[in-house]
């Protein structure tokens, strides 16, 4: 990769703490019904996938997330077309900001949990302190989502009453 294409892509720079409206368009940014998936939902899928890689809990996110990562990479490196041998987003240094947060989860969890109505992550912090790993989070408030992203490196999914959101909840978790 050239210096231009190896530039880091940071979700927190795209949506953290700023009052901006972003929408990414690519072949993978469409819902099953053909509507465009909101940017926040795209980042929820990507961040949950990256934080659950290597665990079975990444499965619900895997296909869509890998497509979205490809779209984002292609959009960000549009000026320079370069063949890459790298396999994962980590090897591209994409989204490294998701792992530079104050409250990362343990690599060897004792149990798994989901964080519904997450707020800024108080329940998650308590569960992580007990050795748990969060495999899904949702929060409808936009400001709380931004704080959650900066604290945990994950964009919580939005409205839990939507079927599209429910489809990403892993089947097998402990709490």
Question: Whereabouts are the PLM-identified features?
Answer:
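Conserved active-site and SAM-binding loop architecture
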Residues: 2-175
